[in-house]
A protein has these predicted regions:
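Short, well-formed alpha-helical segments that are part of the catalytic scaffolds
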Residues: 11-25
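A conserved acidic beta->alpha catalytic loop
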Residues: 22, 37-47, 88
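Short beta-strand/loop segment that forms part of the nucleotide-sugar
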Residues: 30-39, 59-63
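Glycine-rich, basic loop-to-helix element that forms the pyrophosphate-binding segment
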Residues: 63-79
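Short aromatic/hydrophobic "clamp" motif used to bind/position activated sugar donors
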Residues: 84
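Conserved donor NDP-sugar-binding/catalytic core segment of glycosyltransferases
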Residues: 96-130
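Conserved nucleotide-sugar donor-binding catalytic segment
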Residues: 122, 126-211
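Catalytic core of nucleotide-sugar-dependent glycosyltransferases
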Residues: 198-205, 212-239
Length: 291
């Protein structure tokens, strides 16, 4: 199997059908569809039993609610494909997405490439983050973001073995981990093959994670701190390192187990970020109390 299209699902029965239809319309069928249901309380289980297809394998698994990143870890364990393509339950693919991915895989030049990456578009056809002038390039994700100054979410397709080597950290008392943890870890070891073609349609919903991300991070401070501490140690602009340490302290004040802080090596200058982090934490608390 060449590709695993992986969908973590939680109470998205009203959008999954659109994704299913887009998969059936693919011009190249060389994939399986793997769904991990993260404890949905709507009719997602019943709906997924109807997604039988003579075109491609459909596999459905239901797990106890632990959050999207835990579902991704489970999906990587179960995947049969060489490449792992995370497609959220409220998004869908253009008809030629898998055809384009198949063609781009054949154009990979470096053995260090661990990720294929195309563009995400809004339903209107506009690229998320604005238009770009390049055709294709192989580089680290850090170079692509900060040297080429590319903005906006992208559509990453990762070698399954690479995902398995860089699983998200999980904690029994937390249900969230920033997706940047996975991609930063991969970028330190692997190149990405970028190509300037749309392979993903994205629509941000008002009940999605991005709509209430501050509250979510406050409720999962351990994973959030890991993200910001690791990001600050990456080859990123100094301004981003400063913001990372400010956010490290900001969400560190949400920790119930203060001993968790001992696992981090905090540079001396990062203590200057303590006060702005505390001020942002106070603002977050006041903002949440008003809601």
């Amino acid at each position: 199997m060449k590709f695993t299209i992986f969908t973590p699902a939680y109470n998205r029965a009203y959008t999954l059908g659109r994704l299913y239809d887009s998969l059936r319309k693919q011009t190249v069928i060389n994939f399986e569809w793997l769904i991990v249901d993260d404890g949905s309380t709507d009719n997602t289980p019943e709906l997924c039993t109807t997604f039988e297809s003579d075109l491609f394998p459909v596999r459905y698994y239901r797990v106890q609610n632990q959050g999207k990143c835990a579902a991704v870890n489970k999906g990587a364990e179960l995947a049969h494909g060489e490449w792992f393509y995370i497609v959220d339950s409220d998004d869908w693919l253009p008809e030629d997405a898998m055809e384009r991915l198949t063609a781009e895989e054949k154009l990979i030049e470096s053995e260090r490439v661990g990720v294929l990456c195309g563009m995400r578009h809004y339903p209107s056809g506009e690229r998320i983050g604005g238009n770009l002038s390049f055709s294709r390039v192989e580089c680290t994700a850090f170079d692509f973001r900060y040297r080429m100054k590319v903005k906006g979410d992208l559509a990453e397709v990762i070698r399954t073995e690479v995902v398995r080597e860089n699983l998200y950290p999980q904690f029994n008392d937390e249900h969230f981990c920033p997706v940047a943890v996975l991609f930063n870890r991969i970028a330190l070891k692997h190149l990405t093959h970028y190509f300037n073609q749309n392979i993903y349609y994205c629509k941000y919903l008002p009940d999605g994670l991005t709509a209430h991300i501050t509250k979510v991070r406050m409720e999962s401070p351990k994973a959030t701190l890991i993200c910001y501490a690791e990001q600050a140690a990456c080859p990123v602009p100094f301004a981003l390192k400063v913001r990372s340490w400010i956010n490290f302290w900001r969400f560190g004040f949400c920790l119930q187990q203060k001993d968790f802080m001992k696992r981090f090596r905090i540079p001396l200058w990062a203590w200057l970020c303590w006060l702005p982090g505390w001020l942002m934490h106070r603002r977050d608390c006041k903002s949440l109390n008003k809601k």
